[in-house]
Design a protein with these regions (language model features):
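Carbohydrate-interacting/catalytic domains
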Residues: 1-134, 157-168, 172, 425-427, ...
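Non-transmembrane alpha-helical segments in soluble domains
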Residues: 165, 169, 214, 280-284, ...
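Short, contiguous acidic/charged loop-to-helix segments that flank catalytic cores in large enzymes
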Residues: 197, 201-205, 267, 309-311, ...
């Protein structure tokens, strides 16, 4: 058979569809197989179709080994590679589209042309956008531990969709973000140590079933975001590590090993860049995902994630080129960076020397918020700034507020269990914390179980504690989250123009002794006033000073009895009085229950008729 050459872009790092060129694909008379292994002395193909007896492959000048075989879809295969040291090692296909269930390590034949027929989401795809002026409220989840069957086994992708989608719709989330689904050998890595970058993990079914999962989400109005690991990969000998007997995908020095015991990708090699470009693109292209969240970007930007070792310029160029290429091919895709550093211009366009991401996780907001709500009440005066500081830098990037899986494990406790106070006070504080999150500028992300007020830390081997819904406070809390998310959807001022400084204004940000915060969100429908009392004492007729006279109509309170609070019903509308301080000549007096928040719509005062 005459082989076509790989596109030149592959070697320069500009290829975004490698899954169409390498790996295994049906061809006339069987299947074609290709693997890039330039340092190998020999490569053989073995699988179900040849009794696992190595069949010879031929090498081209670029180091790509190829052959054809009479095989059938669903059969398993591997490449047997002879390295420069004279040893043979079996490897899974780096570009395999499907894989054997662990502990097996073989690749599985799959025809990618079958995927497009699974989708009926044309209307959704035509309406995709980056949600800059739309609500974006993300439910982060691990597919294997959200819910399990009565016998403890996993739901497959289609079964998971049937269980999950009604829950997402009920709680008015806009997107689901899946912890990495690329194939991985170790359950305890949560998907962050990959061996198969192009294959949805076989734990939960087939590529076709995953495509149907995405399609079902789209038909229900739910976007799908994929967590992606572009910095490091599993060190397993059957994967990418020393694939051709040399340091091919990884660095060959001390920077080749990550803090997790994995191998760091060599961003200076064009073929590695093309591999990663394509590994991200496949989720957007073949599986219709709406965006990519890129993990551990700080570990790429700086050598070993250490700013003192300097910026990794190869990684910077890789991220810029990848983001630019993805945006060109998928203009509506949402690209998000998990980056805990102060690296500048993460969300600036590449043409302005930025990295080209659409959003960046606000790790500072997360730490400050959790630290504040864990602080004893009598020490909060000194911690008051933790809830105001985020707005001093918020407009430097396009930030996304996240309370992710990383904050629910390894002894950190879950969100509600971190919070200071008695059992009842923890619930009041949790309602207040999420109110603060939903009324603060920035897109939102919460990890599964947070809506249940989950006290047990996340364990990938167990489903969530769904029995919590039998307890009144937990049942009320998940209904509270659904209502709060609904409020976010319903009020444009909570998401439109949120990256415009003119759409936010502090009303009370120096009330340290009282623990009171108040701020305006401005948008269509008029301004909204958010007020928070972070102390376990009530304030009656607390004064808030405004620049315009208005009537304040309560839209939402965290303290309603239906949520587990003490207030029977929202307060009646209150008009400002013509007195004030500091150039704010109108005073609004509000009653603030302990550990509570409220959102008011500010309406113009009726005009007095002319006499």
């Amino acid at each position: 058979m005459t082989w076509t050459m790989l596109p030149q872009e592959y070697h320069t790092g500009a290829c975004f569809d490698l899954y169409r060129h390498l790996g295994a694909h049906p061809c006339k008379g069987g299947w074609s197989f290709r693997i890039w292994a330039p340092g190998a002395l020999d490569v053989q193909l073995e699988g179900d179709f040849n009794g696992w007896q190595g069949a010879p492959m031929s090498r081209d000048n670029a180091g790509v080994w190829s052959c054809t075989a009479k095989a059938k879809e669903g059969q398993l295969y591997k490449f047997r590679v002879l390295g420069p040291d004279g040893s043979w090692v079996e490897h899974s296909d780096p570009c395999a589209l499907a894989a054997e269930l662990r502990p097996g390590t073989a690749s599985r034949l799959f025809d990618l042309s079958r995927l497009e027929a699974q989708f009926t989401d044309g209307v959704w795809m035509a309406g995709q956008d980056k949600h800059y002026d739309r609500p974006m409220n993300i439910y982060e989840m691990h597919a294997g531990s959200w819910k399990r069957k009565p016998d403890g086994s996993w739901y497959d992708y289609e079964e998971l969709a049937q269980e999950l989608i009604p829950w997402l719709v009920e709680h008015q989330y806009t997107h689901v973000e899946l912890l990495p689904l690329a194939e991985h050998p170790f359950d305890g890595s949560w998907g962050y140590q990959n061996t198969g970058y192009f294959a949805p993990t076989s734990r939960y079914g087939t590529p076709v079933q995953f495509a149907r999962f995405v399609n079902a989400c789209h038909l229900a109005g739910i976007g799908v975001l994929m967590d992606f690991v572009p910095v490091h990969f599993a060190k397993n000998a059957d994967g990418l590590a020393r694939l051709d007997g040399t340091f091919l995908y990884e660095y060959d020095s001390d920077v080749g090993q990550s803090e997790w015991g994995t191998c760091n990708f060599n961003f200076y090699r064009g073929e590695v860049r093309s591999f990663l470009n394509s590994a991200a693109a496949i989720w957007l292209d073949l599986y219709h995902c709406d965006g990519i969240r890129m993990d551990a970007i700080s570990r790429a930007l700086y050598w070993l994630g250490d700013p003192s070792r300097g910026v990794n310029q190869g990684a910077v160029q890789f991220l810029q080129n990848m983001n630019q290429g993805l945006h060109q091919r998928f203009p509506s895709a949402i690209l998000t960076a998990e980056d805990s550093t102060n690296f500048l211009k993460v969300t600036a366009p590449v043409e302005y020397d930025g990295l080209g991401f659409d959003y960046k996780w606000d790790m500072g907001w997360m730490h400050d918020t959790l630290d504040f709500f864990a602080t004893p009440f009598d020490q909060r005066r000194d911690a008051y700034h933790k809830l105001t500081f985020s707005m001093s830098y918020f407009y430097n990037e396009l930030y996304l507020l996240s309370l992710s899986h990383d904050e629910m494990v390894h002894g950190k406790k879950t969100v509600i269990d971190k919070l200071w106070g008695t059992y009842e006070e923890k619930f009041a504080q949790a309602r207040l914390l999420y109110f603060y999150m939903l009324t603060h500028p920035g897109k939102k992300l919460n990890f599964m179980g947070s809506e249940l007020a989950h006290f047990r830390e996340w364990d990938e081997e167990r489903e969530l504690d769904w029995m919590l819904l039998r307890y009144p406070l937990h049942d009320a809390f998940h209904k509270y989250i659904a209502a709060l998310n609904g409020l976010y959807h319903a009020e444009p001022a909570l998401y439109e123009g949120e990256y415009n400084a003119a759409c936010f204004e502090w009303v009370a940000c120096q009330s340290r002794d009282e623990g009171i915060y108040a701020y305006l969100r401005k948008g269509r429908g008029g301004p909204l006033l958010a007020v928070m009392n972070t102390q376990p004492k009530a304030y009656l007729k607390y004064p808030l000073y405004l620049t315009e006279g208005c009537t304040a109509r309560m839209l939402f309170s965290t303290d309603l009895q239906q949520w587990g609070g003490t207030t029977r019903a929202p307060s009646q509308p209150q008009a400002t009085l013509p007195s004030g301080v500091f150039g704010r000549n109108h005073t609004l007096y509000v009653d603030l229950p302990p550990l509570s928040g409220a959102l008011y719509r500010l309406e113009e005062l009726p005009r007095k008729p002319r006499g």
